[in-house]
């Protein structure tokens, strides 16, 4: 498929974005992109992966790269094509021939070939980064580094000595649940992928003494 990309977005060391990912850290290493409305898809596109090939400019390497969607490009030029990508500086440089990164970054809007691909984070398992406002009555976290589809259909949380409870997806990669009584850990998290409907269980992944802003890594990922 043919789309367009440009470079007004992130530097290699940037963090955050609408999806809330730590984009400069492994395994992303800054190889990220903001997506136009059809790609970001109201947050459903957070964490999805795309292969991009640039061959319409002399500075293009004509070698594909893979990027993860971590932010939104909401309107204006971003909505002018069926698909639009705003690449990070590092990702834009990776599309270029050796020594031609700055030339490609200054080229403006480029026509590219793209396709959705499965995410593959080697030697990395799913992680849960607790939201700054999370508390025992309001559990919320960002889910990071899912292999495969990269997007999730369902997440369920199981408190200590309790049943699995469905969580609600916010307009990003954040999932939340509110409770009238405090929820106590350790917590099991069950995740269902959106496309393949595969299920993985992260057992006791969030400890009883969890804290906001902390990241808890599981020992599982989609295959």
Swiss-Prot record:
Q: SUPFAM superfamilies per the record?
A: Barwin-like endoglucanases (SSF50685), PHL pollen allergen (SSF49590)
Its GO biological process annotations read:
anatomical structure morphogenesis; plant-type cell wall loosening; sexual reproduction
> Where does this protein chiefly localize?
secreted
Which segments constitute the Expansin-like EG45 domain?
Answer: 16-124
The subcellular localization recorded is: Secreted, Cell wall; Membrane
* Cysteine disulfide partners in this protein: 19-46, 49-119, 54-60
SMART domains under this entry? DPBB_1
Q: Which PROSITE patterns does the protein's record reference?
A: EXPANSIN_CBD, EXPANSIN_EG45
Which residues are modified by glycosylation? 213
Topology in membrane: Peripheral membrane protein
Q: State a GO cellular component annotated for this protein.
A: membrane
Which family is annotated?
Belongs to the expansin family. Expansin B subfamily.
Q: What does this protein do?
A: May cause loosening and extension of plant cell walls by disrupting non-covalent bonding between cellulose microfibrils and matrix glucans.
Entry protein name: Expansin-B6
Q: What is the lineage of its organism?
A: Eukaryota, Viridiplantae, Streptophyta, Embryophyta, Tracheophyta
Gene symbol of the encoding locus: EXPB6
């Amino acid at each position: 498929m043919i789309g367009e990309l440009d470079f007004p977005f992130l530097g290699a060391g940037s963090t955050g974005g609408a999806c809330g990912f730590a984009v400069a850290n492994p395994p992303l290493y800054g190889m990220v992109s903001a997506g136009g409305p059809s790609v970001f898809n109201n947050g459903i596109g957070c964490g999805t992966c795309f292969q991009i090939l640039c061959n319409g400019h002399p500075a293009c390497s004509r070698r594909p790269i893979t990027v993860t969607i971590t932010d939104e490009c909401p309107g204006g030029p971003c909505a002018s094509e069926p698909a639009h990508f705003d690449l990070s500086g590092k990702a834009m440089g990776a599309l270029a021939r050796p020594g031609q990164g700055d030339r490609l970054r200054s080229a403006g809007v480029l026509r590219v070939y793209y396709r959705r691909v499965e995410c593959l984070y080697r030697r990395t398992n799913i992680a849960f980064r607790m939201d700054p406002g999370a508390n025992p009555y309001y559990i919320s976290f960002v889910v990071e580094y899912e292999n495969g589809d990269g997007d999730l259909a369902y997440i369920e949380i199981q408190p200590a000595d309790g049943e699995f409870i469905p969580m609600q997806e916010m307009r990003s990669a954040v999932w939340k649940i509110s409770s009238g009584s405090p929820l106590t850990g350790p917590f099991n998290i069950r995740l269902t992928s959106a496309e393949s409907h595969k299920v993985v269980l992260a057992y006791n992944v969030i400890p009883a003494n969890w804290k906001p802003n902390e990241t808890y890594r599981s020992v599982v990922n989609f295959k």
